Amino acid sequence: SKGYVIKTSSNHFYEITDKVAQRVRITDAQVNVYHDGKKYKLVIRGIDKMLACNKLDGVIESYIDGDFKGYDGTTTFKLANLQVWQQDSPGIIYTNLYKPVVYIYRTSEGYKMKIFGVDDDPIIVKKK
């Protein structure tokens, strides 16, 4: 779905910008990347259409250190790489995950954090 972040086997990161009604849960899916200048498209096995995306540079890949119960609008995230980030956008979600992987990347809206295991759009965060 829109906003989902994919890491390819070549360790490049892409954020899907198209809306996709189809929901496919495939781990290690085959992904082909096509680009024309700065425009990128992904073909993902199991999804019926080519998806527009942004290539992401400087992605921070880590995991939340310990239990993760969700976020409430002002949540602070302590990562295993010793960085601390704070939620900077409204939103509440409840979950129960242990050391979920996170990707943090810069966008025109600021930094976004994608928390794996949470089926929600990436949230806006700021470094503390």
Describe each model-derived feature in a short phrase.
Residues 1, 54-71:
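Structural detector for short beta-strands of small beta-barrel domains
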Residues 1-19:
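N-terminal targeting signals for Sec/Tat export/insertion, comprising classic cleavable signal peptides
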Residues 2, 10, 26-28, 73, ...:
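Short, flexible surface segments
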Residues 2-6, 40-41, 72-77, 111:
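Short aromatic-glycine-enriched beta-strand elements
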Residues 13-20, 84-92:
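Short alpha-helix capping/helix-loop boundary micro-motifs
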Residues 20-34, 90-105:
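Short nucleic-acid-contacting surface segments enriched for D/E, G, S/T with interspersed K/R
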Residues 38-51, 109-117:
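Short, Lys/Arg- and Gly-enriched loop/turn segments at beta-strand edges
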Residues 118-128:
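Short, low-complexity, Pro/Ser/Thr/Gly-rich segments in the mature regions of secreted, periplasmic
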